[in-house]
Regions:
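Short beta-strand-to-loop capping motifs
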Residues: 60, 131-133, 166-168
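PLP-dependent enzyme catalytic core of the Aspartate aminotransferase-like
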Residues: 143-144, 153-186
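PLP-dependent aminotransferase class I/II
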Residues: 37-115, 119-120
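Conserved PLP-binding catalytic core of the aspartate aminotransferase-like
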Residues: 104, 108, 112-145
Length: 186
């Protein structure tokens, strides 16, 4: 894909925001200097649970492009508090390792529970699962105070596809119990 972009004067924008939470994730950052048309987006929102701070960054080896991007940003676009939080978060590699281990354990448990309920669950190495179930599953769960991501607007998927987050065990148990209730009421 990078070669194609280079041959056609296009840029490849790669979102690595979930990469730190995935098993065996391999960043493309080592390719930046060989492929100047590559831009990599990283964010603290997913890996560090810092959604309210809205902090992220872009990696790119094209100095001219970075200069143009800098011209279009506001002078004070990132607060000093957000910068300090980002620097502190990057030092917490042990936190990421613990989080990945938790996700790995909970993902396996959740996949087994959902498969036992009859859901088609796609293999995953990330902190979320893609599954197929009843088209009204989101409504049944919403009545129980649980929101899941409908994926019927994703290319190639219909209204029975959903994405759920892998969370702490107690939260995953609540989700599974609600899904059991939703399926039992059919």
């Amino acid at each position: 894909m990078l070669r194609y972009c280079a041959e056609h004067g296009a840029r490849l924008f790669l979102d690595e925001c979930f990469l730190d939470l995935s098993d065996d994730g391999v960043s493309m950052k080592d390719c930046l200097h060989d492929w100047p048309q590559l831009l990599i987006l990283k964010a603290f929102t997913k890996s560090y649970g810092m959604a309210g701070i809205r902090l992220g960054y872009c990696l790119c080896a094209d100095g001219a492009l970075l200069g143009e991007m800098a011209k279009s940003t506001q002078p004070w676009n990132v607060s000093s508090l957000a910068q300090a939080a980002g620097v502190a978060a990057l030092k917490e590699q042990a936190f990421l390792q613990q989080t990945r281990a938790l996700i790995r354990t909970e993902r396996q448990w959740l996949m087994g529970e959902l498969a036992a309920l009859g859901f088609r669950v796609c293999p995953s190495k990330a902190n979320f699962l893609l599954l197929h179930g009843p088209e009204d599953l989101h409504q049944a769960l919403a009545r129980r105070g649980i929101a899941i991501r409908r994926c019927g607007n994703y290319y190639g998927l219909d209204n029975g596809w959903y994405r759920i987050a892998v969370r702490r065990h107690e939260e995953n148990e609540i989700l599974v119990a609600a899904m059991k209730q939703a399926c039992a009421g059919r």
